[in-house]
Structures are given as structure tokens and as C-alpha cells.
Amino acid sequence: MTSRPKARLVAVLGALVLASSHTAPAAAQQAPKRLLFLTHAGLYKHSSLGPAEAAVTAWGRDAGFEVTALQGYVQEAPSLDLSMVTAEYLAGFDGVMMMTNGNLPMSPAQRQALVDFVRNGGGLVGVHNAALTFYDFPEFGEVLGGYFRRAIRQRHLFVLRVEDREHPATRMLGPSWPIVDELYQYGTAPWGADRPEENVDVLFGNRIPMGFSRDRVRVLMSIDTELTDLDGLEEIVRGGDYPQSWVREYGRGRSFYTSLGHRDDIWSNDPVFRAHVVGGIRWALGLEDGDATPRGAR
């Protein structure tokens, strides 16, 4: 639980970087886009799944999309039934949002249908623990952009460097965004038998099948190691590269990812975070334009 003084500090600083009180431009007079929200706790159950589902459902009413939530978080992982999520079912949606970890109970054909859905023009929105999903299906990682390797301390005040201030997911921000949340570090190379302890998810032992690369995605935000207090943060070093949000195009589709969203309360009391997530969703759904061209090494 974040301490009240630190939470107030972040709220004040966040207000300074929020350029508009609106989460998105008024939706055009057209049928709302349809977003399927998948939650699943195959490895670890985040308490933020319920608040996230409720928040995104509400936000969509004013942002041009409607949410179908399967409420996977209320079921024990072994009993979750996703047998209906087929290519035909996905055809009824414009995008899929995922706060999931581990292997969802989906057949190889269903997994491939999800990837093909994006390749053929659908949108994918991955939030926080989505990067711990389908370690044994590298094509999912190709769509999302990378896989989780380790968590960076919770309840720490990080300063994020905003690398793209024109994209719908970040244009509400100034050059820096101070925020308290759990951030992630991503695998930079695939696991190899000659390096059995490298490129492995340090929490659950999953072998990372592909490495994150700035040559593949357009990074929107990364940890500013000059402005962030690194005292006690053994996971990162000053001058290191720690992307936390990015976008990419995959075939005719779009993929947006953010590491943020671990905290329950961030889904209800942070207008900057709301604008960030809604902007990313709208971009992934094709409601707004934004450059996804990779810019290579920082």
C-alpha cells in the first residue's frame, strides 16, 4: 500500500504533467469499437484485475469503445473456460485487452487465432502482467513486443522519461512522469542451453523465448535513471535502458503495451494514468493515429 504522503506527491506532480482533463477527444458519432477484456491469473493473482476491468468498462463509454469482460479473475485458473474464444468469436471485436499471466486455457488453434486476429487488423492492448503470458508461444511475444524477466520494486517513486510526446498514449504528458507503481524489466535475449540461468523469468522460472528490442517497437516511455532515486534498487543501474511502454504494428494490426497498472487505486484515482491507458486503447482500436515506427537503440 502506497503511503499517503507519497501518494499525494505523485498526485500533485501528475497534475502538472497532465495537459488536459479529458481522457480522449469526443468520440465521433459512430458505432463504438468493441474491446474484449481477458484477465487470467495462471501464475500470480493481481488484486488490480477487478478494479482494472471496472475502470476500463466505464472509461470506454466516453472514449468510443465498449467492453466485453469475461471476468477470468474471479475464477480459479484451472476452471477458467475460454473455449468460446475462437477465430469466429474474435471476429466480433476490434481489439483484445489482456491483463493475464501464465498460459491461458486455450488450444494451439485458439492461440494462433489470437495472433492472426492482430495480424489481420485487430488491436492488442497488453497491461502490466500481460508480459508474463504464453512463454511457450513466441509469436505472442512478437505481437506484444517482449517478455517479463523481473519486477522492479513496488511502492517506489519512479520518474519515467517520455520519449514520444505526440502519441495518443503519451501526449498528455510532459517530458517526465513521476509515478509510484511496480515496473518491469524485460528479457533482452532468448534463453539458451549454454546459458541456463540467463534470460529466465526470475519469479517463476519461465524460459524467455525472444528478446525485447527497440528495433522492433517504438518506445513511448522508459525509466529515467538520472532522475529516479536508485538507492536500494538493485534491479537497475544508472544509464541502463528500461522501457516501460511501447507500441508496434504487426501485419495490419496494432499492439500497445504498458507496464503500469499493478496498484489497485491507480485505476480509480489517477487521471494521468487513465489518459495514458485510454489513449493507448484508442490507438490500438484505430480510433486515433500515432506513429509506431521503431527508432532503434536509444
Q: What residue ranges belong to the model's regions?
A:
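N-terminal secretory signal peptides that target proteins for export/translocation
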Residues: 1-6
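Bacterial N-terminal signal peptides
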Residues: 10-21
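Extracellular ligand-binding/catalytic regions of CAZymes and related secreted enzymes
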Residues: 29-33, 39, 47-50, 54-62, ...
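Extracellular/periplasmic catalytic domains that process cell-envelope and extracellular macromolecules
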Residues: 29-32, 61, 88-92, 118-120, ...
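Helical hinge/lid and interdomain linker segments adjacent to catalytic or ligand-binding clefts
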Residues: 34-38, 43-134, 267
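A glycine-rich, often tryptophan-bearing local segment used as a flexible ligand/cofactor-contacting loop or short
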Residues: 103-178
